[in-house]
Amino acid sequence: MTSAKVLYFSGEIPQGDPEGDQRTLFRKLHLLSKERDHVVLASLLECVTLTLKDECSKLSPQYRDLLPPFESVLDLTDHVVQLRKTPLGGAIERVLVLVFQLGSLVAYHEAHPLEYNFTPASTVIIGRGSGLLSAAAIGLSPSIVMVPSIAKEIARISFRFGLVVDKVCRSLEVSSDEINSDGAWVYCVHGIGEKEARDAVNQFNEIKAYPSTNGASVFNVDDAGNSVSIGGPPKTLEALFSESNIFKKTKNVAMRKIQGMWHTDRVYGPEHVEQIVPKIESARELHVPLISPVSGDPFRETEAGPLLEQIMEEILMERVRWDMIIETVSKQLKQLMPKSVQLVSIQPSHYNQNMLERWKSELPDAAVSGLTMMPAILELALEQSPPKDTRSSKIAVVGMSCRFPGSDTTEEFWERLMLGEDMHRHIPPDRFDVETHVDPTGKRHNTSKTSYGCFVDNPGLFDAMFFGMSPREAEQTDPMQRLALVTAYEALEKAGYVDGRGVIHRKRVGTFYGQASDDYREVNSGQEVGTYFIPGGCRAFGPGRINYFLNFWGPSFSVDTACSSSLAAIQAACSSLWSGDIDMAITGGMNILSNSDVYAGLSQGHFLSPTGGCKTWDEGADGYCRSDGVGSVVLKRLEDAEADNDNILAVVLSAATSHSAEAVSITHPHDAAQALLYNQIVRRAGIDPLEVGYVEMHGTGTQAGDPTEMRSVTSVFAPPHIQGSRPIPLHVGSVKANMGHGEAAAGIMAFVKTMLVFQNGIIPPHIGVKTGLNPALPDLDKAGVVIPFRAANWRPTGTKKRLAMVNNFGAAGGNTAMIIEEAKARPRLCEDIREAHAITISAKTAVSLSLNIKRLVEYIESAQDLSLADVAYTVSARRRHYEYRKSVVVRSLAEAIKHLQPHIETAKSQTPTLVKRPPVAFAFAGQGTFYVGIAAQIYRDSPFFRAQIDQFDNLARRQNFPSFLPAINKTCAHEDLPASSIHLAIVCVEVALARMCMTFGIKPCAVIGHSLGEYAALAVAEVLSDSDTVFLVGTRATILESNCSPYTHGMISVRASVDDISREADGLPFEVSCINGPNETVIGGTVENLEAVADRLSKVGYRKTRLDVPHAYHTAQMDNVVNELIRQSQGIAYNTPKIPIMSPRDSSVIETGANIDSSYLPTSLKKAVDFAGALNAAWEAGVVSKSTVWLELSHHPVCSGFINRTLPNTSLTCSTLHRDSDNWTSLLKTLSSLYEVGLNIDWNEYHRPFEHALRLVSAPTYAWNNKDYWIQYRGDWNLTKGQVLPEAELPAVSGFRTSSIHRLYSENYDSSTAHLLGECNMTDLSLKGVIEGHAMNGYGVASSFLHAEMAFTLARRIQEKASLSTFTGMGINVTNFEYHDPVVKDASSLDPYPIVVDAEANLEMGEVQIKWFNPAIEKWYCHAIAYYEDPSTWLSNWSRTTRLVTSRIDALVAMSNKGMANKLTTSLAYTLFGKLVDYSSMYHTMQWVILNEDEAVAEVVFPADTQGDWAVPPHFIDGVVSLSGFILNGGTHFDNVNNFFITPSWKSMRFAKPLAPGGRYLTYVRMIPEGVDDKGRLGSYVGDVYILQDGEIVGVVEAILFRQWPRIMLNRFFQPVGMAPPAPRVEKKRDAGRGTLPSSSSLQEKTTATAVTAKITARFPGSVITPSRSAPISKSGSSPKIVPQLDYSLLTPRTSPNSDERIEKTDSDSGFEEADGANDVTSRAVEILAEELAVDKGLLTDECEIADIGVDSLMSLVISQKLREDLGIEVRDAFYLEVTTIGDLKKLLS
């Protein structure tokens, strides 16, 4: 007997609400189709969807416009009711019936694949109406996988079937709306037979005289023959049942859900079949009988095409005889006589029950049952298999971090929410000045009407060194981008992300961040545009920098959709995960407010509340309150997160973004667009919207936005037609009421809040309603919507997961929303039975290490229900590790606290581990300390270790050795173990331990084995294969047992050297077996001999220990064993070692690649083990060193002591196992020690055997060593930009202009002080001759004497204007003059080159402080002090010196006359001077020079015209003073061929009488050495210059200093600003094809005279622009031009000099004062590096890694250019790729 199946497909859609019953099933089918076990279902839905879209594309426009957009055919379920009112209603319904039936059947049989066993002999298929099409699909599909392909064609037929029926029916009766709007086209009539019904219908049609097409017809007879179905136009049927006496008596039901009528040949014919059924190429045939509902017989056609045509003919034109179908099926069942009959149907129906009852009565011996697909599908469990593809995955949120107002952590953020805090406050001063930038009236230009916002505290705080950024780069990088980097890192820490761990690869990780403003770039860093202005401020660099720092290769997107930017970024991240582009995303948003313009613009646009915070849903809502915010979350596909053992905070089911395209304005919300979006994400998520329990609303607090959003939310999640029947209340909230509107960060704020709501099971109180609810909101009570004014519980209940929606809108019209589901709790699948755990903590600095320890201790102390194993797993396996480290091995949390607390302080002084990880040498012990149960616990718990051991044991047994597992798992006593088992256990355990350690990241640099341990060493060095190792060890042991009598010989370990033992043995026989250390020796021999030697040794006090071994290894007892072992091991192949092997046999090192003789191991059994000799040989060969870490792989530490005593400088020696300790604890202590010395332990591998028992805990994130990097917005230029302001161009003081001071910015006097600020334009025509006539290196130079003239000029101006009687007749002494960074002019440039001169006088002291500022290099470069003194006093003092000076002059003249000194003419003197200075004729004032080595006198005659308006003409000063320079640069006594000499300073310059035009003077000077440089060379010379007129000293320049410099430095000192220096003489090799850097002159902003004020004001904002008291009216007739009155304190150097150092000396100008830069290139290069990075030079040690201090590609460009310019050396622009540390850079430069 067999089993029979009857498959029944009705033509009905599910009964009840089509948006209820259908939607429930279709949601289930949608969710099932995402799973890997339901790929056929997914294929079916896809095929039908594609077919439907294809058919719809062929419709006329008026029909196409009736269809809503849809992603899947299932989406149309939401539109069934609306579509019924259109001509497409029937077509869509027919397709949905097909999907409903085939989808249910396919889904069920994918879950129960064995039940799809429909055989022709025992299966029959029946169907009604359009159900015949579904029946045909199954009949034509022998396999379930074949269903989708035929369903594609049948879906086309179904759709066309509906269209044709609608078209035909509308031709019979006009209907402008739903085809059934005027009545039903079909009635079901009970209590009447077919004949009676047909006669009555025919009679009625004749009486009414309808056209034949419009009459009624009987088309269906039920199985009992007493019910019929009658079809016809609604008006015809209405008349029939109201007028016919026969039908008035019957019970009839109008079938309003059936769209039109068919089964009548009065209106349908073959032409309609042709329109519906396409030509089908498929050659499929029925594989089971399909019964015709017309004839009751199987369809005559069996091939797909003809069969479908026949089916369509019967559906359209033939009457249904259901009674005949049932009769045929019953007859076949009776003939088959099955043991069971199963009726398989799609949905419950009275037909099902009728059939089952009949068969039960007719087949009493058969088990008759029914299987209904619909309830069976609804009962199928979800998530029983992984997603079928990435598109079907859920997205897990696994980590998050934030910087929100008042909240630096998510915990603080939650606390603020639960306390109901409103974080709005006045704009803090670090953003901009509220007093000037806020005007509540809005009348003032560019001001905001509101002063409120919600702000992150100290947004500039950042750990630049951690992220490898220089302070300079950090300062110029937008704080929101920095905080995005910080929060991304913290979120990854919370997620437990470690590169290379789990299923995520860094090449498939992307970043997505929302950012909608550029405040910092536009305002803060824009004030001082620098190297990092672009990468620090442009939006793309925000996510790009995260990718770069974390080494992620995936995409990085910066998203701007205005206020929805961050949620849109999260949605983009989800989409990228769903598309399979990436496997992990870091996403979020950022917003830091500092630009007053945005405040002003939003105020003017009426976005902002003038009264404070966001009043969401309040009747007085008046706009939003702006907010800072930066947040990051980490997303993965759910299956990946589960595989990685992540903490899953919540799960994103669906997310989408749309646009309010039909809103009244671009910024206005649109509820229809919002509702459409919600429906879309609900469908994608496959959820019932009524089960959503919480919606985090956008809720900005505006009168337009709040009601619109509430209407759209309630229309979907609490719709009017179900109000009051929601299964759960719908809570709504908005974080903006607490935190303000974060704009680009608003979405991430809402998202993080929702994560916390899920985590804590509480909905925080809503504080936005300050007065009363906005009356424009819908009736929330009626809708079941709850605004929680107090915290509301929302905890998990039952099996259903909580659902929430996060909503976010953008001001530009974008809408983003997502459905979020709570994460299910994952059970621990095993137990972690390890006794101890390592708590590892690391940092990049000692400060952070201390803070990390402190925070972890506080966390452990405060956390509840915390597991030590979880904490250890989190901080070791799930964290990154850095150079500063601490690790403690503990057995409890209390012990962890106890051991960690002391290190909070000690960590502050801890030194980092080496950048280069220490090498590790493996040592393998012999058998001396064997015990049963070695590595038993590791064998039990570690799959890797167990697999290794099992493989070795399998090899041993296959080579006929006994299993050695009993020696490990303690199933045998020690004395019962054969030697082969013991030896194999030892060696195999050691090799397995070594390999396990390698999986932990510990790779050996060399190996050494002691005795038996050499076999393990050679195996690890890959000299021996596993098989050969087992063979050699097993054979060796077997031969030992058979050739040596046990315990006739022995071994004794003695704490003495070989020489000591030999001396004390005094001829007694013994053999040296092992030399383990300098004073550690093992001797062997017969028992008798050993006892005699032992007695001798005991008497002299040597410690000795008898070893528990049965033989005397490495003695003559082994002779026979060695020979036999050599014989039996001839077939063993020794490979060349992959790493060096320290050989105790030969006291040598076997290098990598060396050949090893096959007798090596056999003979080592006889030879002494010189372990110490091997160690020393390795030390001498450099194979090991003091930095080498030693790891002993053994069952008990033996070799460790030998190593420590032989190599006492060894840094660390440790071992894996200890016989008296738990295996895991011993191993862990070793790993902990190795970790602390800098090895990168793979803690994931260590924890892998127990990971299913471990959970990631929310341990504290990294403690940053923050510093504040914030460029303050200075002044109020945001208010005035774009306005035409008066220019500062005219001289400030009427009539005051000299040849050196071209205008005064300001001039102020009071009773005791005076202050002048002036300008000297180096391109002014008045200076042309003076500067170009003093040329050096081919360029005109503003000499020190020109600066002296300016000092005389300003001091005289003050003297004249102060009008103090005490100054009358006073002379001016220019003292303490210092000149750095010479001002060099390019004669070809006509661009203005202004120099600012500042003079500040203390009139009571008679002192003027004068300093010069060069805007081109932004540096104070020169300084002097002028004193008002009595010239008569000078003359009196000088008179005492006159005789001495004149005597020296006379002596020189006499020497010249005798030819003992050189007398030079004017021409010759200036020709010689031309070696350094090319003087023009106006400087040629020396008439003759007498020169004798370091002493000279000259006659100077000045021209009759001063050629300008000067206080003291600079060329006159040069004429009388430059003799000092001529001695050095023009004579032959000093080396001025290779060097040059220039003056940076003098002590004083006084002229008691004016240097008069036409005057004749003598000048005398002697230059003497002034000390030596740091290399013992003469480096500077000093002299006093005397100026005499008519035998009287009238002027003295005291202590004028000249410094000696190599001539190669001329290019450095005398090069115009912005011009590239010529190529150096010797270049280092350059990269071929490397482009050259453009000269900075091409990039430098041209400076105009007017721009000086602007530049200084920009550099030192806060300067008050006020008219000078003497400001004149412009001669041009234009508006008065105001000269700025500057705040002089702001013109001081950034670092105020002390009293002894009045000018700003930087490393770049210290060349005149410091050691010779050309001879100390590397030192100067490091100084340049420190300058450009803005770091302390002390940080730049040789070990400092350049990446850690921020040397990247851009900074590398800057530094390389500076090295060219300042030092004349050539390095690659990308030198940062060639070096790692500062030490490397020094080597490169040297």
Swiss-Prot record:
Residues 1699-1708 have a biased composition (Basic and acidic residues). It catalyses: 6 malonyl-CoA + acetyl-CoA + 4 H(+) = 2-(2,4-dihydroxy-6-oxidobenzoyl)-5-hydroxy-3-methylbenzenolate + 6 CO2 + 7 CoA + H2O. Residues 1716-1790 form the Carrier domain. Residues 1302-1435 are annotated as: N-terminal hotdog fold. Griseofulvin is a spirocyclic fungal natural product used in treatment of fungal dermatophytes. Residues 1298-1615 are annotated as: Product template (PT) domain. Residues 1460-1611 are annotated as: C-terminal hotdog fold. This is Non-reducing polyketide synthase gsfA. It comes from Penicillium aethiopicum. The lineage of its organism: Eukaryota, Fungi, Dikarya, Ascomycota, Pezizomycotina. The gene is gsfA.
